[in-house]
Amino acid sequence: MAATAGRLFRASLIRHVSAIPWGISASAALRPAASRRMCLTNALWSGSDQAKFAFSTSSSYHAPAVTQHAPYFKGTAVVSGEFKEISLDDFKGKYLVLFFYPLDFTFVCPTEIIAFSDKASEFHDVNCEVVAVSVDSHFSHLAWINTPRKNGGLGHMNIALLSDLTKQISRDYGVLLEGPGLALRGLFIIDPNGVIKHLSVNDLPVGRSVEETLRLVKAFQFVEAHGEVCPANWTPESPTIKPHPTASREYFEKVNQ
């Protein structure tokens, strides 16, 4: 009886170990959840060949593209410290910055989320909302918000943190790393009609520029309002170009004196 139980245990253990993603040790996979998350995080940020091998997004879903309608999403978010169901429909008539980050309680992620939150009023001034998304639960989001910033937490938030626990939103937006089961740093600017105007995806170790995101929102809005196009490094104080062979000369003569 004992021998049979031992064989069953060893067979179960072998199956468990064989299912562990590359770049993560068997001993790490058997640790408690918090320890496993730290091990997973270290492996993904290590830049090793095994970690890079795990960086494969799903090929069974059509990735969204600029000029196409944004994939629909719905889920539970933490908004002003409360749980709230939100969806893409809630942002009709507004610009939306939807950005994905890998995990709560990590390192680069809080710097990005806090930076967007601190600039929330400037986004609101141009009729734009900001929503952050990760594969963590809304309970994890709330716990992170309730953690002081000096301890790596988020503190008070002026933007929504959306839970994608099923990973379906990340998958639909083409940013899910199927192996480790987390999202790359994808950022989408969606216009009031639900059309994607901009998308970018960073590898895990590098954060994004909030100032550049705000500049892009303003640029797309300027084009819509004035019918002129925005040159490289455009700011609201910069000259723009009339998209016509003759009329465009005004701009080129002005900047090339």
UniProtKB/Swiss-Prot annotation:
Keywords: Acetylation, Antioxidant, Cytoplasm, Disulfide bond, Endosome, Lipoprotein, Mitochondrion, Oxidoreductase, Palmitate, Peroxidase, Phosphoprotein, Redox-active center, Transit peptide. It is an enzyme of class 1 (oxidoreductase). Residues 64-222 form the Thioredoxin domain. Its EC number is 1.11.1.24. Phosphorylated by LRRK2; phosphorylation reduces perodixase activity. One of its GO terms (cellular component) is cytosol. It is found in: Mitochondrion matrix; Cytoplasm; Early endosome. Its main location: mitochondrion. Predominantly expressed in adrenal cortex. Also detected in liver, renal cortex and medulla, and adrenal medulla (at protein level). GO terms for biological process: cell redox homeostasis; cellular response to reactive oxygen species; hydrogen peroxide catabolic process; maternal placenta development; mitochondrion organization; myeloid cell differentiation; negative regulation of apoptotic process; positive regulation of cell population proliferation. The active site is at 109 (cysteine sulfenic acid (-soh) intermediate). PROSITE patterns: THIOREDOXIN_2. GO terms for molecular function: cysteine-type endopeptidase inhibitor activity involved in apoptotic process; identical protein binding; protein kinase binding; thioredoxin peroxidase activity. The modification N6-acetyllysine is found at residue 92. The modification N6-succinyllysine is found at residues 84, 92. Residues 1-62 form a transit peptide. It comes from the Eukaryota. The modification Phosphothreonine is found at residue 147. Thiol-specific peroxidase that catalyzes the reduction of hydrogen peroxide and organic hydroperoxides to water and alcohols, respectively. Plays a role in cell protection against oxidative stress by detoxifying peroxides. Acts synergistically with MAP3K13 to regulate the activation of NF-kappa-B in the cytosol. Required for the maintenance of physical strength. The active site is a conserved redox-active cysteine residue, the peroxidatic cysteine (C(P)), which makes the nucleophilic attack on the peroxide substrate. The peroxide oxidizes the C(P)-SH to cysteine sulfenic acid (C(P)-SOH), which then reacts with another cysteine residue, the resolving cysteine (C(R)), to form a disulfide bridge. The disulfide is subsequently reduced by an appropriate electron donor to complete the catalytic cycle. In this typical 2-Cys peroxiredoxin, C(R) is provided by the other dimeric subunit to form an intersubunit disulfide. Belongs to the peroxiredoxin family. AhpC/Prx1 subfamily. This is Thioredoxin-dependent peroxide reductase, mitochondrial. The gene is PRDX3.
